[in-house]
Swiss-Prot record:
One GO BP: small molecule metabolic process
PROSITE patterns from the UniProt entry: DHDPS_2 (PS00666)
Source species of the chain: Thermococcus kodakarensis (strain ATCC BAA-918 / JCM 12380 / KOD1)
Pfam families: DHDPS
Name under which the protein is recorded: Uncharacterized DapA-like lyase TK1237
Quaternary structure annotation from Swiss-Prot or TrEMBL: Homotetramer.
This protein's encoding gene: dapAL
Record-level GO cellular component terms: cytoplasm
Keywords for this protein: Cytoplasm, Lyase, Schiff base
Domain of life assignment: Archaea
């Protein structure tokens, strides 16, 4: 698996129930434009605001609808046994990968994190993508990632959502250098080209919900060695990522941008998250007009 993977938003109705027709429409759109992978129950999908039953429902619905891209299911939780249960479910429905962020809320030692992932890997067979997002959960150090990948062949890659070129560099040199089949993805739009240049495999990036054409054009230009064009798209993505600075949360930023671009997904976040108002929406609109 390489390329542009989209961590999709979860569409909600005004009453906060899941908007299934909007989900179907969005998955159809992303596959038609040619993204390489679709990731459901992601951070962008507000998985922490979903019940276990809703997460299972979305995973099953996504598996039914995603037919022309790699299919990834998020199974993270602070409860190791629940992660195993959700990961087994992702495996049983035929997902290509399970994406698992570390436990959050309670700080854990590296040994505790190793045990968490070890238990999951030993109880499941599905390929696992580690997800390092230290702003929201316990951090995965490079030595810990290397130890896990050496011990467990099913740990197939990592998504790194942190503003550090050095971390990506070290994962590629120290981990991918030992296991050539290990996949390395950035979670930040502005680091997409950096990651490819360093030898990574792509990105799992939220702005691809509303502007996948930029990510896809960059990836194509890079692979075809049209580097000036790739640099231009990278500059656009760097500017586009400023959308996160405009809004009060990444969820609000993405759903406002989708509204501005004409998607039918409603600008609704589940509590406790809140949407920004008209003033922020107009700033998002101005940014998108400048970049796109």
């Amino acid at each position: 698996m390489r390329g542009v993977i989209v961590p999709i938003v979860t569409p909600f109705k005004e009453d906060y129930s899941i908007d299934v027709p909007a989900l179907e429409e969005h998955l159809d759109y992303l596959q038609k434009v040619g993204v390489h992978g679709i990731f459901i129950n992601a951070t962008t999908g507000e998985f922490t605001s979903l019940s276990k039953e809703e997460r299972r429902f979305l995973a099953e619905k996504g598996r039914e609808l995603v037919t022309s891209a790699f299919y990834l299911v998020g199974t993270a939780s602070s409860n190791t046994l629940e992660v195993i249960e959700l990961t087994k479910h992702a495996q049983d429905i035929g997902a290509d990968y399970a994406v698992i962020a570390p436990p959050y809320y309670c700080p854990l030692t590296e040994e505790a994190l190793f045990r968490h992932y070890s238990m999951i890997a030993e109880k499941t067979d599905i390929p696992i993508i580690l997800y390092n997002i230290p702003a929201c959960a316990n951090s995965l150090s490079v030595p810990l990632v290397k130890r896990l990948t050496i011990e467990y062949p099913s740990i197939a890659g990592i998504k790194a959502t942190l503003d550090s070129v050095n971390y990506i560099r070290d994962i590629i040199l120290d981990v991918k250098g030992e296991r050539k089949d290990f996949r390395v993805f950035t979670g930040l739009d502005q680091h997409f080209l950096n990651t490819l240049i360093l030898g990574g495999d792509g990105g799992i990036m939220a702005c691809a919900n509303f502007a996948p054409e930029l990510h896809l054009r960059l990836y194509k230009a890079f692979n075809e060695k049209r580097f000036e064009e790739a640099f231009e798209y990278s500059r656009k993505l760097a500017k586009l990522s400023k959308v996160y600075d405009i809004a009060s949360s990444f969820g609000s930023a993405i759903k406002l941008a989708m509204r501005v671009r004409g998607f039918s997904i409603k600008p609704v976040l589940r509590p406790p998250y809140t949407m920004d108002g008209k003033e922020v929406e107009e700033k998002v609109r101005a940014l998108l007009l400048e970049v796109l």
